[in-house]
C-alpha cells in the first residue's frame, strides 16, 4: 500500500501540483532563513493547495 507514488494517476496528479507550486517551493527554499516571509508564503501556498484539491476531488 506504500506504492502510491508508482501509480500513473498519483504521478500525474503530483506532477500537476508540482508544476503549480514549483515557483513557491523554490522561493521557500531560497528564503528559508526568513521565518516571517516563509510562514506567510507557506500559508498562502497551503490555501492554494487546499482549493486545488477540492477542485480535483
UniProtKB/Swiss-Prot annotation:
Keyword tags: Host cytoplasm, Host nucleus
Asked if the record carries the keyword Flavoprotein, the reply is no
Q: Which residues form a coiled coil?
A: none
Its protein name is Protein PB1-F2
Q: Give the lineage.
A: Viruses, Riboviria, Orthornavirae, Negarnaviricota, Polyploviricotina
Q: Where is this region: Disordered?
A: 1-37
The protein's location, in the record's own words, is: Host nucleus; Host cytoplasm, Host cytosol
Family annotation (InterPro entries): Flu_proapoptotic_PB1-F2
- Mainly localized where? host cell
Family statement: Belongs to the influenza viruses PB1-F2 family.
Q: Which GO terms describe its cellular component?
A: host cell cytosol; host cell nucleus; membrane
Q: Does the keyword Lyase apply?
A: no
Which portions of the chain have biased composition (kind: Basic and acidic residues)?
A: 16-37
